[in-house]
Amino acid sequence: MIQIKNLSCGYNKIAVVDNISIDISEGAFIGIIGKNGAGKTTLLKALSGLLKPYSGNIFLNGTDIYKMKKNLLAKKLSFMPQNMPLDFPFIVKDFIMFGRFPHMNFFKYALKQDYEKIEEIMDFTETKEFAERNILELSGGERQKVLIAQTLAQETDIIAFDEPTSHLDIGSQSSIFRLLRILNKKHGKTIITTIHDLNAAGEFCSNLILMDKGTIFSSGTATEVLNYKDIETVYNTTVVVKTNPVSNKPVVIPVFSDNK
């Protein structure tokens, strides 16, 4: 259980997230949605212990994460940032191994169990086929899978992703979201991710948090959050909301008029 209580945080003494309180249950698949600048990434950074709050607390199973040792937190919660710079020609399997650091001994030597875990993760993420390749040679979708593999190598129960499908085609997006859903449904991982694609958020996430101007505008199931009134208010655009005939999940469709 994650409890966020009266959290305010930001940069240069300016609050980007303002007095947020919400609970996240174990095993949930949470999608954080909202316009650019709403505070989604800032909230994830605070949740991951990377950004100290101006006020408020974040508790993980009753313990304030900012009072936990970093190595202990890294064994409980992992975070994959958006657009992580990949400027050095790492071999893919070596790059994934970096995720094992919290579990390694004092000298940071990889042991047999670390190599076995990496093999298991590469199988799961379908990255073994390019394990020996230079990471700079990979496509956008392949790189994202490698980043996910490195994040999974931390072997945490809670995983936070910042826009894991940004700049990817629909096929790569679907592949990654299916991967996250398997992690959630079959492996019991708690997934928290920011998403710009409202329809992907509604399709794959168990619950959504709609942010606006640093606050939580609404939260709940996809059907509860993705209603046309709230979406039009937050995004300042006209939409209609239909139902996917296969999944029965809401589909948000922007409406454009030649008269405007």
What are these regions (language model features)?
Residues 56-64, 73:
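Conserved ABC transporter NBD signature motif
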